[in-house]
């Protein structure tokens, strides 16, 4: 593990966009595979490679760039009281959850809808159906983790640490994104989430 961390650290310092793009895209893809294999929407559903490719594209080309920039912004600009570590960390978590998450969630659903070849009207409907339940679920998952992430993890590793936890979050997002508006019931084999 130490060898991987050393390689990743050197790689992210040498070529941050490429490293973060590859890592984030890969982990978005893994999350989608988990969603498809572990929590299929319909019994006997076949694996959809194109769906995984869309997740990789979103993670690599969109989220990795925005996420990395966001974490750097938070670290450099969200300083409530210089020298007050926990106050600044709490402010960063607050910004992340009250500014980034409410925008990032509809961005995910909108972009994925477009990548699926759906219309803007369909994308809007997907966002309307999923934004609030996903945001509430986000608040159950992310604030505690981000408190640890922003307080203990160096800024150049924050996206990576988020990506590791995001494997399961991405599986959840992928599952939610795959449900059509007419599918209101969550399969019994999927962990319960607040809606």
Swiss-Prot record:
GO terms for cellular component: mitochondrial inner membrane. Its main location: mitochondrion. It is a multi-pass membrane protein. Keywords: Membrane, Mitochondrion, Mitochondrion inner membrane, Transmembrane, Transmembrane helix. It comes from the Eukaryota. The chain crosses the membrane at residues 21-39, 55-71, 98-115, 159-175. It is found in: Mitochondrion inner membrane. Belongs to the peroxisomal membrane protein PXMP2/4 family. PANTHER family: PEROXISOMAL MEMBRANE PROTEIN 2, PXMP2 MPV17, PROTEIN MPV17. May be involved in cellular response to stress. Required to maintain mitochondrial DNA (mtDNA) integrity and stability. This is Protein SYM1. It comes from Kluyveromyces lactis (strain ATCC 8585 / CBS 2359 / DSM 70799 / NBRC 1267 / NRRL Y-1140 / WM37) (Yeast). The lineage of its organism: Eukaryota, Fungi, Dikarya, Ascomycota, Saccharomycotina. The gene is SYM1.
